[in-house]
Amino acid sequence: MATTLNPSEISDLIKTRIEAVKLSAESRNEGSVTSVSDGIVRIFGLADVMQGEMIELPNNTFALALNLERDSVGAVVLGDYENLREGDVAKTTGRILEVPVGPELLGRVVNALGEPIDGKGPLGATQTAPVERVAPGVIWRKSVDQPVQTGYKSVDAMIPIGRGQRELVIGDRQTGKTALAIDAVINQKGTGIKCVYVAIGQKASTVANIVRKLEENGALAHTVVVAATASESAAMQYISPYAGCTMGEYFMDRGEDALIVYDDLSKQAVAYRQISLLLKRPPGREAYPGDVFYLHSRLLERAARVSEEYVEKFTNGAVTGKTGSLTALPIIETQAGDVSAFVPTNVISITDGQIFLETDLFNAGIRPAVNAGISVSRVGGAAQTKIIKKLSGGIRISLAQYRELAAFAQFASDLDEATRKQLERGQRVTELMKQKQYAPMSIANQALSIYAVNEGYLDEVPVNKLLAFEEGLHAHFANTQGELVSKINTTGGWDNDIEAAFKKGIEEFKTTGSW
């Protein structure tokens, strides 16, 4: 007599049989490419893949797993994808993306994967680190109280930057954003601060020009240049800031100071938007994906000043009593001065202040074109050098009063003496804040210029001769008070003796009339 099975028994039997089948590791860790388009590969059958994992493809090509769906994986190819075909085998690697780190990278130009592209041979780096890392926790951080000198009077006096700060440089195209950041890198020569310059989506010719300028000014030796140019894929432009940050963190973790420039994060957001739309992620405001804020916040939060305990723990006691820092200068390009667009507002809210560069000021010959009214440094004041902090208070006030009165003076024909003096002082302060590119100024020279204008020594100097006067004054002090100049540059201190020397030196120089 035939055995009859009821439906529930059949169901149980099938379940038991399925559970008894042991899938081999190979079948869980191997899949096949189902489609390749626009740098995105869809892979079927990778059951064990992790978010952000490296996937190995034929011809030594790798992809980054970004979308984990029910029965397929969406991954972005790192590099060329012309040789990939439907049906190609894809394998999991069990690793996330890592890049080379260490002092061997200084003086070199690398791509987003840390591969040298400057024709100077292999890097020789022995260590690697993952491009994505959780930012240091609150317990491991220290407050920002050491300065990063940019060499610009307007920035160091009014918008000071500290080690471990994130200071946004924002403005329209062609307003001098990159110039300001490159001069800040050049000014770190001899300070021990290591620099990382990340070029995102820029022309290769522009990057080559920047590298040449760094070399000419002796700054390439302490700098790593990470370049993901406009001709490279969106994936490379998306990961390049994280790769650069990892290279900078190497120095921070070991009790050293580093400065990183992201030029610029607007292009990274565009690259990420492109990848997200190709992966069929739902678009949000301005077609950016929902996590574009997290894209930048997780990057910029990695810039910090870490405590002695953090460094000691990280190095297993090899480095003691030293704090480390990574200072970030992200750059954002605005359209027609619109700082209320999606990405600019995001980055403004993440950073510790912003330097706003204005087209009108730039075209009027005021360079760097810093708008002192809406530029701010939220934490840098505590890090400012003592002498600059003491002297620079009058600068902001003079400029604010000048801007207010200048608008009013357009309609008034006869002005009283006090108003006229304020206007003239404001004109001189504005003129004095001008500075040539690739000519960062030392602390002593900045202090001297600020002191001279604050104390009224420049009131009789014609505005058009002001910069020549300043140049001559600096040369006079270098020749006659060399010891004092080097003392100020070393200590950054301020006392009555220095003030007396400043007064005497300025009066002496004015009597020579050699300007």
Swiss-Prot record:
One of its GO terms (cellular component) is plasma membrane. The record marks S375 as: Required for activity. The keyword rRNA-binding does not apply. It is a peripheral membrane protein. Keywords: ATP synthesis, ATP-binding, Cell inner membrane, Cell membrane, CF(1), Hydrogen ion transport, Ion transport, Membrane, Nucleotide-binding, Translocase, Transport. ATP binds at G171, D172, R173, Q174, T175, G176, K177, T178. Produces ATP from ADP in the presence of a proton gradient across the membrane. The alpha chain is a regulatory subunit. It catalyses: ATP + H2O + 4 H(+)(in) = ADP + phosphate + 5 H(+)(out). F-type ATPases have 2 components, CF(1) - the catalytic core - and CF(0) - the membrane proton channel. CF(1) has five subunits: alpha(3), beta(3), gamma(1), delta(1), epsilon(1). CF(0) has three main subunits: a(1), b(2) and c(9-12). The alpha and beta chains form an alternating ring which encloses part of the gamma chain. CF(1) is attached to CF(0) by a central stalk formed by the gamma and epsilon chains, while a peripheral stalk is formed by the delta and b chains. Its EC number is 7.1.2.2. Belongs to the ATPase alpha/beta chains family. Its main location: membrane. This is ATP synthase subunit alpha. Pfam families: ATP-synt_ab (PF00006), ATP-synt_ab_C (PF00306), ATP-synt_ab_N (PF02874). One of its GO terms (molecular function) is ADP binding. It comes from Xanthomonas campestris pv. campestris (strain ATCC 33913 / DSM 3586 / NCPPB 528 / LMG 568 / P 25). InterPro entries: ATP_synth_asu-like_sf (IPR023366), ATP_synth_asu_C (IPR000793), ATP_synth_asu_C_sf (IPR038376), ATP_synth_F1_a_nt-bd_dom (IPR033732), ATP_synth_F1_asu (IPR005294), ATPase_a/bsu_AS (IPR020003), ATPase_F1/V1/A1_a/bsu_N (IPR004100), ATPase_F1/V1/A1_a/bsu_N_sf (IPR036121).
